[in-house]
């Protein structure tokens, strides 16, 4: 082994011969061909050269060594690679130090030794080390042959190993130290230990290998880690076995308790069976070392046997089952069927099981619920539900909705507990959707509502803006039925909301929908502030919306813009030139004066508001207008407020729902989506929604249908109440819809019976609009704490046969708290009743005074249409309210602007006389129309 050829060494290193010759020449070893022999010194020189060239610090080199065996099976060569191991190769410096130490042990160097003797001694030591390595390899081979297949040696002969990654064959060095690696699992259990022991030297003269202190410490550390890992695995296995034993014991205990309770109930009490399984499982918890891999394998095998019945394999499977059956007392039964499973019974256990009690469910019943959903909540079949309802006289299907009362009766009849659930609130459902899908808020166009008196030029202003900015040059303008449109300006887009009257605007505010961002208040410069103007200001302030005042008709000679500013200042609308915050723009809708300045002011207000809305989210909006089209069905104008509305979305609007089949913009063009503040016409709803209804997109069609049906049932009573309110004698039935006022009272009496009787009598006075709230009642005099409670709650104090002390009276006088003293209970009840009556709103009744028939319509320029009429019934007064009726349909409700007989203004005209009259703010009258005159009378109400 000491002399090998270059070609053999290159094959061992798996490198070309030319590269090896080149490296040998660079290392100072002169070799010319592959047949030249290599000595041990040549290899050491090559190793030292390559170590320096590769930048190594001269430390130990680790090489992964594998053993490859080639065998011939049926004429085919088969290459088998066995498990590799890591060999630590010392550097040249370490090797030289080991050789020197070996020389020192073999023969101490004499002081007078010459240089030639030292060289000879080193050569002899190297030869002895090589001979010792050969002897160790031969001894290991002999022991491996004796051990046979029981334990394979983990350390292979150095001559049979091949280095995979190292460029040099350092494994042929004479003094190779024994590596210390982590042992395999079978070696940890004591197998193959003899193979790991180094062979004894063949000749006693050969010295033992030298092991450095650092390497010995490394070996000890690895041994300590292996022992710690082994102990940790054993502890985990022991803990697992203990946990499994405890689980089995608890399971047995629970089964025994259940069995004892069942026997006690049926009257056949038996002694409880002692717990045997925990004792049987006790040996598994013995403190003995267990191989983790073997334990895991056995545990997996046991689980497979328990889960799939693998113990019954082989010829003796049947006998094994019979033996197990006999061990269990013979109580093993086979279920019917092709794959009949064994029903294992405990000893002395009967196959008959007592019937369990029926499970009682607590069912939450909403306002409306389908038969199938109710059956699912009670865990019964739908057929049983339909049968129970048919016995009640209701012929329903499984998909039909039933009301809450009926559902509660059926739930109780079937033996379950029914409780009314909270109503499904669509707003709460919408809030959940918004929380689940939060989108980034982006700037959106402002929504502007134009308000004001009809005669002040509101319609003309909208027409001019529409004609000038929206469809310039298009014939016919925009679609006339839509109530909203947007205008593009150089500074941005503005969406105008054109709702007839104030009903939709008020409905939006009542529902809390912020549909309008800015209000343009139109006031005629020649007319001044009218009652409807004041009403519009109140609406805008209630909504917290900024106002931009457009003073119209400044082109008239009688225009006085300064008077408009003064009148609006009285209603807290102060111009910005006067130190206020409201912009005033003088415009002319007829000539188009300052229209651009008005739009500029609106965009300035919108910029201050910083209006934003999420775009990538389900759409929410408000219904501006809705109608029933003959060819297209229900058509609704929707103003999108948040999100993006897309074609095909499931929309819910009030009691109507449906998938959007088509979307049309204000120009009549078909579109597929609309973003925030964009109005669209939509088709596909199941019914015509009301103006002002909130609309939202839901992902679930079932949820949309459920909410729509719930709203239909909820609003049914409201619609009936509205129909009853049309009758004069049933006006009181509509009182409960308004928010009730509260009268807070604190009662102090001399005895307990007095304040209990007084509190009970006062609570009976509560009505739909006014309720009595007894905050506190007690026995004794009136104290400062009672007065402080009255101050905080705004209540007044009733003292029944008691008085207040001096400090309480002084505090009540300073804080304006009313204290009333009574000795008779009826006086207290009458005073509280009178106070509650004063809190009631007066009752308003319409009293019809006369009927007028229009027989002629006269059009006068700059004045309007004048109606020539005949009073057919009653009397017509100048200050009467009128109702215009055409074909038995009410067209308009308003007031009279003037009433004349011939050319004289009169206060009233009686039946049988002719008269001429004009309607205030309305000119669309025709011959044959009828006017119904009525007065509104307020009547004080009492309890």
Curated annotation (Swiss-Prot):
GO molecular function annotations of the record: GTP binding; GTPase activity; translation initiation factor activity
InterPro entries for this protein: DNA-bd_dom_put_sf, EF-G-like_DII, IF2_II, IF2_N, P-loop_NTPase, Small_GTP-bd, T_Tr_GTP-bd_dom, TF_IF2_bacterial-like
Sequence similarity: Belongs to the TRAFAC class translation factor GTPase superfamily. Classic translation factor GTPase family. IF-2 subfamily.
Biased composition, class Low complexity, residue ranges: 99-113, 145-172, 200-215, 251-264
Species of the source: Neisseria gonorrhoeae (strain ATCC 700825 / FA 1090)
Pfam families noted in UniProt: EF-G_D2, GTP_EFTU, IF-2, IF2_N
Domain tr-type G positions: 443-612
Subcellular location: Cytoplasm
Xref: PANTHER family: TR-TYPE G DOMAIN-CONTAINING PROTEIN (PTHR43381:SF5), TRANSLATION INITIATION FACTOR IF-2-RELATED (PTHR43381)
Protein name per Swiss-Prot or TrEMBL: Translation initiation factor IF-2
Binding residue positions for GTP: 452-459, 498-502, 552-555
Alphabetized PROSITE patterns for the sequence: G_TR_2, IF2
Residue ranges with Basic and acidic residues bias: 117-141, 173-197, 216-250, 295-308, 319-335
Annotated region (Disordered), positions in chain: 99-354
Function: One of the essential components for the initiation of protein synthesis. Protects formylmethionyl-tRNA from spontaneous hydrolysis and promotes its binding to the 30S ribosomal subunits. Also involved in the hydrolysis of GTP during the formation of the 70S ribosomal complex.
Residue segments, region G5: 588-590
CC per GO annotation: cytosol
